């Protein structure tokens, strides 16, 4: 069974840091592109970070809203994807999801999602 399980969320003050984890199972993490997506309190989904697969040396990409503050990485030996979040702001408050990328025909899509972990940034 393919599973993604996020953890590491919580309450943090503005300017603080958190590291989210996404434990993966049922597939080989190094073979897949992986993504982080968040859902704001207004229910808007926002893509924030990508980690490409081993073929592309696990290179990363970020949305403008988090670039320079968030870092995505992975530990393939433990099958865990990470999101290091620094200089957190109130607008980073959201439910954070990891997702696996899949390719079908000419379309990329997220075929597996975790249940999410909640991050609240407030003083």
UniProtKB/Swiss-Prot annotation:
GO terms for cellular component: extracellular region; immunoglobulin complex. GO terms for biological process: immunoglobulin mediated immune response. Residues 1-114 form the Ig-like domain. PROSITE patterns: IG_LIKE. Coiled coil: none annotated. SMART domains: IG, IGv. GO terms for molecular function: antigen binding. Disulfide bonds: none annotated. Keywords: Adaptive immunity, Hybridoma, Immunity, Immunoglobulin. InterPro entries: Ig-like_dom, Ig-like_dom_sf, Ig-like_fold, Ig_sub, Ig_V-set, IgHV. This chain was isolated from a myeloma protein that binds phosphorylcholine. This is Ig heavy chain V region HPCG13.
């Amino acid at each position: 069974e393919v599973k993604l399980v996020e953890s590491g969320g919580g309450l943090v003050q503005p300017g603080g840091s958190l590291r989210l984890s996404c434990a993966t199972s049922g597939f080989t993490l190094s073979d897949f592109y992986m993504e982080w997506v968040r859902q704001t309190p207004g229910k808007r989904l926002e893509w924030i970070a990508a980690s490409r697969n081993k073929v592309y040396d696990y290179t990363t990409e970020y949305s403008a809203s988090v670039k320079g503050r968030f870092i995505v990485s992975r530990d393939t030996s433990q099958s865990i994807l990470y999101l290091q979040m620094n200089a957190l702001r109130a607008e980073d408050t959201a439910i954070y999801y990891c997702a696996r990328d899949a390719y079908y025909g000419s379309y990329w899509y997220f075929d597996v999602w975790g249940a999410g972990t909640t991050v609240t940034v407030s003083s």
